[in-house]
Every structure is written in structure tokens, then in C-alpha cells.
């Protein structure tokens, strides 16, 4: 079995703004099916999506069995408001909002929870993130 363990069916791999604009307000089943078919042709039978706030990953999860693909997704990534993640995830500012997002993810059919704890790695500077990560206490509490 071959797997890809960090995909976002929503994104194209080149222009994230254009990729996001290509879906809402309606999901593009043709595009999702083309991508699932490409994975199938490459012999990949397991995909783990990082999720998105538009529902593309959930639709892909519904379609994936037609291609012999096991598809797992968190439904949407969860991030702290004011930090990295607003372009693709759902945000929280307090524990009550966080718990509500957990319940919504579960009701949506999430297979796991993705909590965004930092920005991106800065590939031009070893060990540097693009923004301050959540504190250890915040990660522990949430």
C-alpha cells in the first residue's frame, strides 16, 4: 500500500488562492474526482487530508471509496484566532469556542483533530517559524 499522509484536496500545490476560489460556494466534484483518479493511477490507496473549512475534504472522503482509496480527514483544521490558519481552518479564541469546534468536527465525520499550533517553517532559516507558536500551556489546555 502506498499513502500520502499530508494532502489538502482543496489546494492545487501551486496557487492556493486560485485553488480556494475554484470551489466555494459549490464543491467541484469533477476536480476532486480527477485528483482521486490520479492518486489511484499512482497506486496510492490511503490519503490523509489536513482538512479545509469549505468541505472539499469531506466530499473527497465520500467519493474516495469509488477509487479504492481510504480517506481520512479532520473535517477542518482548528487554529487560534489571530494566528496562522485562517485561510483554511476554523478559529477559536476561548475554550468554549474550541469545544464547539471539536463537537462540530465530530458531527461532520472527522477522523481525527488537527490543531494548528504554529506557523510554517521558514526554509531560508533553520529552526525558524513564520510566527510564534502556541505556548506549551495552551497546547496542554487545549
Residue ranges and their predicted role:
Residues 2-62, 84:
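Metal-associated gating/positioning segment near the N- to mid-region
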Residues 24, 86-93:
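The substrate-binding groove and active-site-proximal loops of carbohydrate-active enzymes
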Residues 28-37, 92-106:
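Short, acidic/polar
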Residues 31-58, 68-79, 110-124:
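Divalent metal-dependent hydrolysis catalytic cores, especially in the metallo-beta-lactamase
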Residues 60-77, 130-142:
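Alpha-helix-loop-beta-strand connector modules within alpha/beta enzyme cores
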Residues 28, 53, 94, 132-135:
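Charged, low-complexity surface patches
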Residues 11-15, 80-83, 120-125:
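Short acidic/His/Gly/Ser-rich catalytic and metal-binding motifs that mark active-site loops
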Residues 97-116, 121-142:
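Histidine/acidic residue-rich metal-binding segments in metalloenzymes
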